[in-house]
Amino acid sequence: MRIWWLLLAIEICTGNINSQDTCRQGHPGIPGNPGHNGLPGRDGRDGAKGDKGDAGEPGCPGSPGKDGTSGEKGERGADGKVEAKGIKGDQGSRGSPGKHGPKGLAGPMGEKGLRGETGPQGQKGNKGDVGPTGPEGPRGNIGPLGPTGLPGPMGPIGKPGPKGEAGPTGPQGEPGVRGIRGWKGDRGEKGKIGETLVLPKSAFTVGLTVLSKFPSSDVPIKFDKILYNEFNHYDTAVGKFTCHIAGVYYFTYHITVFSRNVQVSLVKNGVKILHTRDAYVSSEDQASGSIVLQLKLGDEMWLQVTGGERFNGLFADEDDDTTFTGFLLFSSQ
């Protein structure tokens, strides 16, 4: 900053010299304030090359380089001199098997070998064909007398002999053929009154009501509507028919199916004899079954639902019926 003030003073003084003939030197002025920083100068020239630095520490080993290309085969070296025999070295490791060599030529035929031992007996061969017929041999000597031959055929009938004496009386002959039917005889006397024949009877027909429809499963169905049960062979309290007359019976059942599927079985003494099933679709369906059975005294028959409450669609109301019937065809007494 001082340099700028100095230059300014010199410029003023020079102006005054031009305007006046003489100039007196004044007192030094007050130093001015420092000026602003000048612009950066240009880069200097490169200096001289410095001394060689110390050797750096060894770097980390580099990764192995790629294998170089194989060199050309060298020329055969000169034969070595034969030296004294060295000490026998240790046995080397076994080398890998070499490749199979080419097949050798066939050698000359060897001499005949010695006879071998007799081998075991072979299996029996198949039967050979029949050979040709040989020439007829000479006639042999006469053999011993043979046994007596069988009787010869019957000879012709001889002449009739003289009449013999009368024999004894023979047995009575078989009855003769039945004769022609005779004339109708007179009316006989009236007989006595016979005993009245009483035929055994057993029959029933029962049905369901509004109260007993949709019965429980796996138990006898208790039909509470009595259509015919004169001899009380069907027990409405337990839902079973009991045989009082041994014989052959006919059983049948008619079912109105509504709202649910139906699956029932006709049971004899706990054994299911006849099965009927109907899948309900819409409106009302009908299902039935019938059978003829031989029963003994005391046998029990009943109808029951099987398969659970999904199959108890047996229906009854004022216009629809579900019935169970059984009756005796003939007795075996």
Curated annotation (Swiss-Prot):
Signal peptide: 1-19
TM segment ranges: none
GO cellular component: collagen trimer; extracellular region
Name of the protein in question: Complement C1q and tumor necrosis factor-related protein 9B
Ranges of residues in domain C1q: 197-333
Subcellular location: Secreted
Organism domain of life: Eukaryota
Taxon lineage: Eukaryota, Metazoa, Chordata, Craniata, Vertebrata
Region (Disordered) residue spans: 24-189
